Amino acid sequence: MEFKVEKKGTNKAVIEVEVEPEKFEEGLQKSYLKNAKYFKIPGFRPGKAPRSLIERAYGEEVFYDDAIDYVLNETYPKVIEESKLEVVSRPEVDIVQVGKGKSFIYKAEVYIKPEFGLGEYKGVEIKKIEYPVAEEEVEHELEHLREENARFISVDREVQNGDIVTIDFEGFVDGESIENGSAQDYELTIGSGRFIPGFEEQLIGIKKGEEKEIEVVFPEDYQSQELAGKKATFKVKVKEIKVKELPELDDEFAKDVSEYETLEELKASIRNRIKEKNDKRAKDEMIDAILEKIAQATEIDIPEPMIENQINYYVEDVVRNLQYFGMTYEKYLEAIGKTDKEFREQFRERATKAIRNNLILEKIAKVENIQATDEELEKELERLAKMYNLEVEKLKERLSEDDIEYIKEGIILNKAIDFIYENAKIISEETQSESQPE
């Protein structure tokens, strides 16, 4: 087998492959063995007629289709491997020559990862981004901790806004019970807005053990068409009234909810955690700004199949999430009023940017000879094993060579990101002010 590659532009290639006649003959024989049973030749049982008689009766080309498929499947993957082309699409195949006793020649046109020259990627100037920790953020986290550790205490008084009440209720429309319109020991927070407008407000003032008939009107846009806009009566009994009691913010609280001895230590821990989150956000945004500047100085002709594959990835992720909530993709599209094409199109810009950035980082890694070391691979495998609650050796047993290569590629891309960040010129406001003439 011989082949030659012709590049077309920066992201396409045409491969011409010449396969020896013996290989095509092998394909013809396999096609004959597969299909002989479908041909009727007088004097022979199905599948027993010689190939030559079938070809004489039905034409020499009768076994060509499957023979061609066989040769393509046998040779194309080897050609791609030997050519070292980074193919990103299915091939468009054109048969140049085919026939018994002849070399089988075909052309395969494919999209490949684009070739491009890198713009300047060292010393890229960007503004420093910072997100200082606001005291309000710390207070918000503390309030969240208080809410998580609140106690609920029964009280013997009238219902007030904000109370948690336990009720029995039954709803009626035109004197008939509402289907699924009743419940026992139902917990409701007054003022939460979980019930029909007007329901919760009418419970205010009722005491524990009391019953009351509440009249409401279902909203016009209510989910059940049968009830939308209709008047309803609910018979309600208040069985328990509870109030939420938040713990005091003091040293005892800190000891109860954390490993710290004092409230100030707890606050410091929260502050550090928020700072780490804010610093990561700032760094991510600065890296994005660096990549954007490199991209502006770099011209890449991204093949459409690469973009479509990335869009497929995003859509499949949405479908998986919808399935988790018991919803089909078709129903979701109907609910948001979009076609499949419109929904996919909204991911195009994001997909293009993701591919562009990855291509740039791959190129930088290649130019700078950035590799994944054995130690880095082992560390990443340990992290993944911990994530999936597996022993490292068990995880290794499950991973294929392709999986390992994929993990290595991730390590290399992350190191390339670190490289451009460490080599960027990050200018703070103070530096800008100092450099400006008076």
Curated annotation (Swiss-Prot):
Q: Which keywords describe this protein according to UniProt?
A: Cell cycle, Cell division, Chaperone, Cytoplasm, Isomerase, Rotamase
| Subcellular localization | Cytoplasm
Q: Does the keyword Plastid apply?
A: no
Q: Which reaction(s) does its UniProt entry say it catalyses?
A: [protein]-peptidylproline (omega=180) = [protein]-peptidylproline (omega=0)
GO biological process, alphabetically ordered: 'de novo' cotranslational protein folding; cell division; chaperone-mediated protein folding; protein transport; protein unfolding
GO: which molecular function terms? peptidyl-prolyl cis-trans isomerase activity; protein folding chaperone; ribosome binding
Q: Name one Pfam family in it.
A: FKBP_C
InterPro entries the UniProt entry points to: PPIase_dom_sf, PPIase_FKBP_dom, Trig_fac, Trigger_fac_C, Trigger_fac_C_sf, Trigger_fac_ribosome-bd_bac, Trigger_fac_ribosome-bd_sf, Trigger_fact/SurA_dom_sf
Which EC number(s) does the record attach to this protein? 5.2.1.8
Query: Is the Cell cycle keyword given for this protein?
Result: yes
> What is a single cellular component term in the Gene Ontology annotation?
cytoplasm
Q: Where is the PPIase FKBP-type domain?
A: 162-247
Chief localisation class:
cytoplasm
Q: Which HAMAP family match?
A: Trigger_factor_Tig
What's written under domain? Consists of 3 domains; the N-terminus binds the ribosome, the middle domain has PPIase activity, while the C-terminus has intrinsic chaperone activity on its own.
Q: Any idea what job this protein has?
A: Involved in protein export. Acts as a chaperone by maintaining the newly synthesized protein in an open conformation. Functions as a peptidyl-prolyl cis-trans isomerase.
**To which protein family does this belong?**
Belongs to the FKBP-type PPIase family. Tig subfamily.
Query: What name does the UniProt record give this protein?
Result: Trigger factor
Species, as recorded: Caldicellulosiruptor saccharolyticus (strain ATCC 43494 / DSM 8903 / Tp8T 6331)
Provide the organism lineage as a comma list: Bacteria, Bacillati, Bacillota, Bacillota incertae sedis, Caldicellulosiruptorales
